[in-house]
Amino acid sequence: CRAGFEKFWLEQAGYLVDVIRQDGSLDLAIRPNQLIAASLTYPILSQERAARMLSVVESKLLTPMGLRTLAPDHPEYQGVYGTGLAQADQYHRDITYHQGTVWPWLLGPWVNARVYAHAADSQSMAFIRSHLQPIIAHISNEGCIGSINEIFDGNAPHTPRGCVSQAWSVAELLRVLSEYPELT
């Protein structure tokens, strides 16, 4: 499996590409799916590569409410769900869903990848804890108390969107808080 991943790794850029097209060309878009390769029980990336990948992902995708689905400097980035239309129809919602929208559930794989790449020492856990505080405040005090919205805008102030109670978002936050009690 690791050998197959080699063709996805961009050595100079320090991250995994999301897509290799049929003609062999690479889609260089920075997306969060690469977190999975470092968040598994048996990670596919080395710790060194995971740390490099996290540096890119955290600088481009990490927000206070989760991870963007596309980096803001990409030409197809949509920072506001539904392209900012007050009454966005299904088409306008769909075209923005994977183009910059923030998904809170991705905080779970991010935490696992960060612990793998940087260990679970007090400094690393403090960094993670500080980045989880906004989503913990959201689940505790905002919207549907005890729940997390499905998505948030990619642009600040990261307005909550989608359904007001998304099980996979809640489950991933509860999972990492259970696995790493020092984060609470």
Language model feature labels by segment:
Residues 41-54, 114-129, 178-184:
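Structural helix-adjacent loops and short alpha-helical linkers that scaffold large soluble proteins
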Residues 113, 117-120, 134-145, 151-154, ...:
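Hydrophobic alpha-helical segments
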Residues 1-73, 78-82, 130, 136-170:
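Catalytic cores of carbohydrate-active enzymes
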Residues 72, 76-124, 174-178:
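C-terminal substrate/ligand-recognition segments
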